[in-house]
Amino acid sequence: ALDYPQKTHETELMILLPIWNESLVIERKLNDLNRDYPFKTSLLVIDSASTDDSVDKVKQWLTNNPSVFSDSQVIEMPERLGKTSAVKLALEFLNQQSFSGLVLMTDADALISEGTIIRLHGWFSDSSIGAVGSRANRQTNLHGEKDYRSLYEMLRIAESKRDSTSFLEGSCMMWRSDAWQIDA
């Protein structure tokens, strides 16, 4: 098992927030991300052609909270192509901007516990770490989904204790921007 690194680092963090029709939760999510980070933190929102006022709410929140992030961008896709295409477009954008820090991807409906982002960030003081994931705290009554996700969570944790896992929890995960190449 890996021990949590004791040394610190100040690698820049880009929070990648893919959204689609998140009007009911987007302000709560942005408030959730409004924390004091001991490293430069920017925000990239990629909207997959929302038909509600999600983008307007994001822009208004950023206008009202200009000092929360070092930099912020909102990319609006002209048509809905799904989360995977949105994330790929965002990563291509970061590549074009020569971004070389860490990327935290999080879902709009996923709340993040206090200290989680700083803890995930801390793992990267070990240069052998390429990606880390968090443990989801799901608030659902769908027992089939909960059982299914619990099984994968148990498998992922067991694999991580042995060496590494082949999949991460998509609602909150972080990786080195140079961990892999995105083909345009």
Residue ranges with predicted function:
Residues 47-58, 79, 110:
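A conserved acidic beta->alpha catalytic loop
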